[in-house]
Structure formats: C-alpha cells, structure tokens
C-alpha cells in the first residue's frame, strides 16, 4: 500500500525575537529594521517569540499581527510557563514551544571539501553539504554561501556566509576581506552592522563560543 504521508521528527534553526519588557511596538520596530537590512535572509522567515522576560500581560493577537507586518512569520512562543498565557497564545494561533536541551554536536558523514573557483554572483546560492566550502574568488552582495562545516573565502566576501548550517558549533569562517551582509555559525548570526570597523575589509576568522560569535584578525 502506498504511504499517504509520513510524520517524522526533525530539527530546524529558527530565529528568536526576545520580548524584553513587553513593549510589542518597540520589539517589532526592531524586527522590521532587521528585515529591511537583510530581506533575503529574514523576509517571510519563521520566527519564535521568547516572552521569558516580557511580564504577564501580553496582547498575543497584536503581537502576531505586528510581527507579520514587520515581514516575518510568527510560528510560536517560548518561555511561556503560565497556563493562562499559554491558552491566550494558543487562541491567537501560536504554538507553545519549549527550549530544547543543549544538544551535542551530531556526527555527520564527512565529504570532501567543496571548492568553488569562479565568482559567486548576486542571486546565487552555494551549499556544501556535510563538508567545508572553499571559495577561491569573490562572493558578491546578494549571494549566499552555506556549509555544514567551515567556510574559507579567498576573495571579498560581500554576500551572506552561513557555516555550521546543520548545527556544528566548531565550524568557523575564514575570510580575506570581510564586507558581509550576514555571517552565521550554527544559527547564531551577525548582520553587517555588528562587524566592527576595525575588522571591516580585513582578513578575519569568525568562530563560536557559548553561542556568541567571536571575530579576530586573520594572522599567521
């Protein structure tokens, strides 16, 4: 008999909007700013709203509409332990999501390094599945390079670079000239405005420690 469908467990990296003080407008204005800065990454992307620090009075219907108006798709709330608030969130169409325990890096089958020798142009996406990615040319603004392992760029990096895409926290990004729209390791990301001026246009190494991105100059 042919299967109609299958329901399986899976894992995804989702952005989380932390509602710090319950001020929905302030939070969604911030969200809209980020969407405008990197629309190819954030526009129409799913987002979870963390309400751990938001207090007990939240208009979940307004929250959902304002997040949608900001350009992202609200899929659930986390940090919601109060039964009344959970019911209100569900009534507004939110899923109740619990933070997962810190997962260990999962072993993967390592494939040979993928090497790209030509320029990666705007609109292109390169994905190195289960391996490192080496780009021996420039990555244009509007391009996206993704690797489950590390990323090495021996040219200007102006597009988006996403390393550790399947959750490898040890992944790093090595770049000869960082001018990136977005950099990400294992779901932790910076937009261009987070890259300090002292590193902009320079050779850098970007790594992850305790879920925080670190950047340092690329030196011998």
UniProtKB/Swiss-Prot annotation:
GO terms for biological process: cell morphogenesis; division septum assembly; regulation of cell division; regulation of cell septum assembly. Coiled coil: none annotated. InterPro entries: CAP/MinC_C, MinC, MinC_C_sf, MinC_N, Septum_form_inhib_MinC_C. It holds the Pfam family MinC_N. Keywords: Cell cycle, Cell division, Septation. Interacts with MinD and FtsZ. NCBIfam families: minC (TIGR01222). Cell division inhibitor that blocks the formation of polar Z ring septums. Rapidly oscillates between the poles of the cell to destabilize FtsZ filaments that have formed before they mature into polar Z rings. Prevents FtsZ polymerization. Belongs to the MinC family. This is Probable septum site-determining protein MinC. The lineage of its organism: Bacteria, Pseudomonadati, Pseudomonadota, Gammaproteobacteria, Vibrionales. The gene is minC.
